Amino acid sequence: MTSITGMIDPFLLLATESHAEGEALIGFHFDFLESNILNLAILVGVLVFYGRKVVGNILSERRNQIAQAIQEAEEKQRTAAQALAKEKENLAQAQKEAARIHEAAIERAKTLRAEIAAQSERDIARLKETAAADLSSEQERVMAQLKKQIAEQAIVKAESQLKAQVDNNTQQRLIDRSIARLGG
């Protein structure tokens, strides 16, 4: 109690002095040395009394806004982390699929290379056979033509020799003999 009465006594003293001079109980003095401390004390008291609620409300509201912003940021972070994990999984699957497609393409290329090589060998063998057959048929044609020419030349030569060696009488005897052999 002594501390309260100790604070009230100077206040009462100032109030009685100001009342004695004809001023109000609490007044504002514009004399710097006399009234500045009292005015500041009153201003601080009013600010503390009324400002506590206002500042408390502002701080509470700000605290709630910050907490809500933190919760929203954490939720966004969780959502982003989930999306990132899903996209990483999709990327891994896509990379596996790309590797599988690449391996399949390599295998297909090897298979096609082998098929093309085999087909080329078959084509070469067929061309060789065709060329050999063409060569063989050409040889046969040339041989047949040569035989025909030789036979024609032999007949021409034989006829010329027969004409030179055989007279009409000998020709008639050969004809008769040939007819007799044939059954006539």
Swiss-Prot record:
This is ATP synthase subunit b 1. It is a single-pass membrane protein. The keyword Protein biosynthesis does not apply. HAMAP family: ATP_synth_b_bprime. It comes from the Bacteria. It comes from Crocosphaera subtropica (strain ATCC 51142 / BH68). F(1)F(0) ATP synthase produces ATP from ADP in the presence of a proton or sodium gradient. F-type ATPases consist of two structural domains, F(1) containing the extramembraneous catalytic core and F(0) containing the membrane proton channel, linked together by a central stalk and a peripheral stalk. During catalysis, ATP synthesis in the catalytic domain of F(1) is coupled via a rotary mechanism of the central stalk subunits to proton translocation. Component of the F(0) channel, it forms part of the peripheral stalk, linking F(1) to F(0). It holds the Pfam family ATP-synt_B. It is found in: Cellular thylakoid membrane. Belongs to the ATPase B chain family. The chain crosses the membrane at residues 36-55.
